[in-house]
Each structure stands twice: as C-alpha cells, then as structure tokens.
A protein has these predicted regions:
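Blade-edge motifs of beta-propeller repeat domains
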Residues: 32-90, 135-149
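Sec-dependent N-terminal signal peptides of Gram-positive bacterial secreted proteins and lipoproteins
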Residues: 3-26
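Structural motif
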Residues: 118-129, 167-173
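Short consensus segments that form the blades of beta-propeller domains
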Residues: 85-89, 116-123, 162-165
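Surface-exposed loop/turn elements that mediate protein-protein interactions on large endomembrane-trafficking
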Residues: 127-143, 173-186
C-alpha cells in the first residue's frame, strides 16, 4: 500500500514538473515579438518607396494616359513610346530596374526599353530616363528621346549619342557623381567649317566650338567611335512595366548593389 502511495506521489510530482517547464517555455515566446520583427524586415528603404512613386506614375500614364504624377523631367522618351506603341506592347517593352551607377551604395532608378527576353530575364541597352536619390528625395539625372541614345558602359560611365542634324552629331561620355550631378569625361561633336565638317572635343560636355579643340579625326572615324561605344555598352536586366503593380522591386533581389565595390 505504501509502495502504491509513493508511486502515485512520484508521478504527480513529475507531472507538475513537466507542467511548470511548459509554462516557463511558453512565457518566453511572446517576448520575441516575431510578427513585429518580420514586419520591420519588410519595410522598404526610403529610396525604394520614392522610386516606386515614379514607376507607378509611368505605369498609370502608359496604361490609361494619366499624367498628373508623371515627372516633368525624364518623360519625353516615355511619351514617345506611348505615341508609337500600343498599350499592351508599351507595358511589355518598357522596363525598370535599380542599379548603383554612382558607386555610393544607393541605387539609381533606370527606365528603358526591353529589346529581348532570355529565359525568365528581360534585357535591353537603351535607357530613356535615369533618376537618383539625394537628400531624401528623387532627383532627375538624364533622359533621351528620338534620334538620341543613352547607354551604360561596363565602368558605369553613361554615353549619350545624338544630334540635331547631319552637320551636328554628338558623343558625350559622363559619369554620375555621388551628389547626383553628372560629371563630364569628354564630349566629341561635329561642326561645320570651310571645307566640310570638323570633329571637336572638350571636357565640359557643352557643344560649343569656341570652347573646344578641333581634333584630327575624320567624320568617318568619329562615326566609327560612336558605333564602338554602342557595341561595347552593357545589357541591363529590366523588369517589365506590366508587372510593377504585383511585384514592385522585389524580384531584383538587391542585385543593383554593385558586387565589385
């Protein structure tokens, strides 16, 4: 009888011990506050939130013509796309991405033209507009339109090709500075002279003959150089504008932060 009583008491004490253990463990869990931590991890950086407003305004403009929120600067090439392409084609061919081309660790917003699809990726060399994030807000950097081209080189220099006619063609090589301004590397341009066209160069990126030096380059050599820059420009992986509403920037996977820096 005593042995049965002792056994019953021992089992009861064991159950109490296990019950207490479970209570202590459960009491710790609410202090971890996992839902709040997960929510914090999902908050996008300020630049993504502001860039999203720009891309959303482009989407709305292409989709239904609403231009109320479309930035004044950087819209020219985008407006041309809407004029010559049908709605669905424009939403498919216009792309957006984030890529750090200034080297400051904060990416720029690039909007451009998708020229091909490989696998699940969408690629193109042409950029229509670039925006950066400086002093807590979006800042316009550059844009192009018909008869001009803006492309990115492997060293993150930006190359603009264009002109106002046969006698005035331009090739500008610039780099984006951390403050959001473009710095000039060099500018080549053609200009009429007595015996035809001359090729001029300066480092101010202003096509002013008097502030430039005439080179010994022929127009043919100048055009070859323009073509070489175009051929050596890099492909950019874009996300199609049509997918912006459902995925935003999430599929970029922070690939825009330059791995080599």
């Amino acid at each position: 009888m005593k042995r049965k009583l002792f056994k019953s008491m021992w089992l009861a004490m064991l159950l109490v011990a296990f019950a207490g253990y479970g209570t202590e463990q459960n009491a710790v869990l609410p202090q971890m506050d996992l839902p709040k931590a997960e929510a914090a991890a999902k908050v996008a950086p300020a630049y993504e939130q502001e860039y999203a407003k720009v891309v959303d305004s482009v989407y709305e403009f292409i989709a239904d013509g609403t231009s109320d929120n479309l930035p004044e600067q950087g819209r020219t090439g985008i407006c041309e796309v809407r004029d010559f392409a049908k709605r669905e084609a424009a939403l498919q061919q216009l792309g957006y991405t984030l890529q750090d081309i200034s080297g400051d660790g904060v990416p720029e917003l690039l909007i451009g033209w998708i020229s091909q699809k490989r696998g699940v990726g969408h690629y193109g060399k042409e950029i229509y507009a670039i925006y950066t994030f400086a002093n807590g807000s979006v800042k316009y950097v550059a844009e192009v339109w018909s008869r001009s081209s803006l492309q990115l080189m492997a060293n993150d220099n930006l190359v603009t090709r264009g002109g106002t006619g046969i006698s005035h063609q331009v090739l500008a090589v610039e780099h984006l500075q951390p403050d959001g301004d473009l710095g000039c590397y060099e500018l080549y341009f053609t200009w009429p002279k007595d015996d035809g066209l001359g090729v001029y160069r300066n480092m101010s990126c202003r096509s002013e003959k008097d502030a430039s030096q005439e080179t010994d380059m022929t127009v043919e050599e100048f055009n070859e150089m323009r073509s070489e820059y175009a051929n050596n420009s890099v492909e950019i992986e874009y996300l199609p504008l049509k997918d912006f509403k459902k995925q935003g920037f999430k599929d970029l996977m922070r690939q825009y932060l330059s791995a080599g820096r």
